[in-house]
C-alpha cells in the first residue's frame, strides 16, 4: 500500500511538471505570434524594429509573471547556453550563408575578415586590459587572467541584427556586406577565442605558448571552414547523383536541412567552430546543392530556411527579455547596486572604445588598397559600421552563462555581478542603441537609389533573392561591372596584373577551376534536374517546339 501511494505521488508530480511545461510552451508560442504581429505593425515606426519589439514583450511578460508569482519567478524557461548554441544559432547562421549575396561578400572578403577576425581580437584585448585595470579597484570578486580574457571574448561578440534590419542591401551593397559579413565572422571568432581561453593553460605564459595559442586559433578557423565546405559538397554530389526529385521533392528538402544541421553538429563533435562550419556550408549549398534540386524544392528551401532563421531570432530576443528579470541573479547584487552600475558602465565604455580602436584604422588601411572611389569606405559608412557593432546580444549572454554559472545558477557574488552586468549591457545596447539606429542611418545614409548597374548586379526578379549570384562571380561578371571598371576580365598573365587587380585575378582562376573541375562533379548553376511533370519538363518541351 505504501509503495502504491509512493508511485501515485510520483506520477502526480510528473503529471504536474508536464502540465507546467505544456502551459509554458503554449504561452511562449502565443508570445512568438504576438511578436510577429506587433513587429509587423511597428515596421514603419521611426524607433522600433522587430528585435526591440520581441525584447520589450519578453520584459513585459517577465514583469507580469514576477507579479503573479509574488516575486518568486520571472520567466517561463531558464536561459540555457546549450539551447542557444545547439538549436537556435544553427538555423540563423546557416541562413546567413545560404542567402548571402556572394559576389559582394567575396569582393570584400579581405576587409570582412580583417574586421571580423583581427578586429575582434583587438576589441577582446582592449576590453580585457580595461577590465583588469578597473575591476580590481571595485572589489567585485577574485578573477584570474583567464577570467579577464574570457570577459574580453564575451563582450567582443557583437549583435548587428538591429542595424541589418534597417540597411537596404540593394541601396548600400558595400555597407550591408561589411556589416553582415563582419557579424558572422565576429561571432565565430568570439566563440573560438572563448573556447581557446577556456582550454588553454594560462599559468605559464611565454612566447612559445603565445605562438601555440595563435596556431590553435588558425587551426580551428581553417578546419572549421574546410568541414563546412566538405559537407556542402557532399550534399551537392549526393543530390546530383541520386535525383531525389524524381521521386519526391520532400527528400531533397529534408536532406538539405539535415546535412546543414549535421555540419554544425560535426563541428561541435570535433571541438571546432560550428558557426564558421555551418556558414560556409550554407554558401556552398547555395552555389551547388540548391541548383541541383527541382524548382519546387528551391522555392521551399529558400523560404523554409528564412522562416526558421526568423523564428529563432525572435525566440532569442524574447527569451533574453524574459530572463533579464531573474530574481536569483539580481539578489546577489541588491546590496551594492552602485557596483553593478559601475561595472556595466565600464564594460559599455570599453565596448565602444574597443570598437573604435579597429574600425577606423582598418577602414583607412582598406581604403588604401582600393582603387575606385565606389569601393572605398566613407567616413559616414565607418560610423555606421562602428555603431552596428556596439550592440550585444544572445552570443554574449550565452558565453557569460557558460563562464559564470553552473547549470544556469550562480552562487558567487562576483559571478552574479558579471551575469547581471552582461544582461544590463545587452538590454541597454539593444534597446537604446537599437532605437537610435533608424534615425542615425537615415541621417547619415539618406535613401539613394542604387545605380542601374549595381542594382542589376545584385538582384534578379526571376530568381530567389540573394541566391542568383554565383560564388566568387559567375558567368555574369562580364556584363555586370561597377561603374568605372573594365567591361571584361582579361586573362591575368603576369605578376604585375595580379598585384594591380588581385580580386579579378582570383575571380578569373576560380571561374576556370569551377567550370573545369567542380561543376561537372557537384553540379551547380546550369545543372537542371529533369523531372517528369515538373515546370522544368514543361519549359524544356516549350523550348523544343519550332
UniProtKB/Swiss-Prot annotation:
Intramembrane residue ranges: 76-96, 149-168, 174-194
Record-linked InterPro entries: Cation/H_exchanger_CPA1 (IPR018422), Cation/H_exchanger_TM (IPR006153), NaH_exchanger (IPR004709)
Full protein name: Sodium/hydrogen exchanger 2
GO biological process: potassium ion homeostasis; potassium ion import across plasma membrane; regulation of pH; regulation of stomatal closure
Membrane topology, Vacuolar segments: 43-47, 133-148, 195-218, 286-304, 366-381, 437-546
Segments passing through the bilayer: 22-42, 48-68, 112-132, 219-239, 265-285, 305-325, 345-365, 382-402, 416-436
Xref: Pfam families: Na_H_Exchanger
Function: Acts in low affinity electroneutral exchange of protons for cations such as Na(+) or K(+) across membranes. May also exchange Li(+) and Cs(+) with a lower affinity. Involved in vacuolar ion compartmentalization necessary for cell volume regulation and cytoplasmic Na(+) detoxification.
Highest taxon of source: Eukaryota
Tissue: Expressed in roots and shoots.
Record's catalysed reaction(s): Na(+)(in) + H(+)(out) = Na(+)(out) + H(+)(in); K(+)(in) + H(+)(out) = K(+)(out) + H(+)(in)
Membrane topology reported for the UniProt record: Multi-pass membrane protein
GO cellular component: cytosol; vacuolar membrane
Cytoplasmic side: 1-21, 69-75, 97-111, 240-264, 326-344, 403-415
Glycosylation sites: 292
Species this chain originates from: Arabidopsis thaliana
Primary subcellular site in the record, as a coarse category: membrane
Expression induction or repression: Induced by abscisic acid (ABA), and by NaCl and sorbitol in a ABA-dependent manner.
Positions in coiled-coil regions: none
Amino acid at each position: 500500500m505504501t509503495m502504491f501511494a509512493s508511485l501515485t505521488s510520483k506520477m502526480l508530480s510528473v503529471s504536474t511538471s508536464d502540465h507546467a511545461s505544456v502551459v509554458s510552451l503554449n504561452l511562449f508560442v502565443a508570445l512568438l505570434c504576438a511578436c510577429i504581429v506587433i513587429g509587423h505593425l511597428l515596421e514603419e515606426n521611426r524607433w522600433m524594429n522587430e528585435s526591440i519589439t520581441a525584447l520589450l514583450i519578453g520584459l513585459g511578460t517577465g514583469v507580469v509573471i514576477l507579479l503573479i508569482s509574488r516575486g518568486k519567478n520571472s520567466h517561463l524557461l531558464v536561459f540555457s547556453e546549450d539551447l542557444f548554441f545547439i538549436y537556435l544559432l544553427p538555423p540563423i547562421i546557416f541562413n546567413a550563408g545560404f542567402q548571402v549575396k556572394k559576389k559582394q561578400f567575396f569582393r570584400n572578403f579581405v576587409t570582412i575578415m580583417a574586421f571580423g577576425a583581427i578586429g575582434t581580437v583587438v576589441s577582446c584585448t582592449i576590453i580585457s586590459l580595461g577590465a583588469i585595470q578597473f575591476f580590481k579597484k571595485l572589489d567585485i570578486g577574485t578573477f584570474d587572467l583567464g577570467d579577464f580574457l574570457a570577459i574580453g571574448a564575451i563582450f567582443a561578440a557583437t549583435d548587428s541584427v538591429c542595424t541589418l534590419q534597417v540597411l537596404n542591401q540593394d541601396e548600400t551593397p558595400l555597407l550591408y556586406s561589411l556589416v553582415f559579413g563582419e557579424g558572422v565572422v565576429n561571432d565565430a571568432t568570439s566563440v573560438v577565442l572563448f573556447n581557446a581561453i577556456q582550454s588553454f593553460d594560462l599559468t605559464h605564459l611565454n612566447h612559445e605558448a603565445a605562438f601555440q595559442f595563435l596556431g590553435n586559433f588558425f587551426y580551428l578557423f581553417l578546419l572549421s571552414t574546410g568541414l563546412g565546405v566538405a559537407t556542402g559538397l557532399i550534399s551537392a554530389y549526393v543530390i546530383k547523383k541520386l535525383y531525389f526529385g524524381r521521386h519526391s521533392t520532400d527528400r531533397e528538402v529534408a536532406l538539405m536541412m539535415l546535412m546543414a544541421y549535421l555540419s554544425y553538429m560535426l563541428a561541435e563533435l570535433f571541438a571546432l567552430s560550428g558557426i564558421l562550419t555551418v556558414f560556409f556550408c550554407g554558401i556552398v549549398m547555395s552555389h551547388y546543392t540548391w541548383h541541383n534540386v527541382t524548382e519546387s524544392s528551391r522555392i521551399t528551401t529558400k523560404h523554409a530556411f528564412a522562416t526558421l532563421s526568423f523564428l529563432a531570432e525572435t525566440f532569442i530576443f524574447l527569451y533574453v527579455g524574459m530572463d533579464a528579470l531573474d530574481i536569483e541573479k539580481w539578489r546577489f547584487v541588491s546590496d551594492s547596486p552602485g557596483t553593478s552600475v559601475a561595472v556595466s558602465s565600464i564594460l559599455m565604455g570599453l565596448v565602444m572604445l574597443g570598437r573604435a580602436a579597429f574600425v577606423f584604422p582598418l577602414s583607412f588601411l582598406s581604403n588604401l588598397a582600393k582603387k575606385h572611389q565606389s569601393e572605398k569606405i566613407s567616413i559616414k559608412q565607418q560610423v555606421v559600421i562602428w555603431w552596428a557593432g556596439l550592440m550585444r546580444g544572445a552570443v554574449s549572454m550565452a558565453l557569460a552563462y557558460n563562464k559564470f554559472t553552473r547549470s544556469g545558477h550562480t552562487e558567487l557574488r562576483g559571478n552574479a555581478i558579471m551575469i547581471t552586468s552582461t544582461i544590463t549591457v545587452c538590454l541597454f545596447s539593444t534597446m537604446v542603441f537599437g532605437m537610435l539606429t533608424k534615425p542615425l542611418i537615415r541621417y547619415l545614409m539618406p535613401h539613394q537609389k542604387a545605380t542601374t548597374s549595381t542594382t542589376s548586379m545584385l538582384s534578379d526578379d526571376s530568381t530567389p533573392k540573394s541566391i542568383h549570384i554565383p560564388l566568387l562571380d559567375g558567368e555574369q561578371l562580364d556584363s555586370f561591372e561597377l561603374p568605372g571598371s573594365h567591361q571584361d576580365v582579361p586573362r591575368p598573365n603576369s605578376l604585375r596584373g595580379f598585384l594591380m587587380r588581385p580580386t579579378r585575378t582570383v575571380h578569373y582562376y576560380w571561374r576556370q577551376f569551377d567550370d573545369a573541375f567542380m561543376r561537372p562533379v557537384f553540379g551547380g548553376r546550369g545543372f537542371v534536374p529533369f523531372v517528369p511533370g515538373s515546370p522544368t519538363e514543361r519549359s524544356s518541351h516549350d523550348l523544343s517546339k519550332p
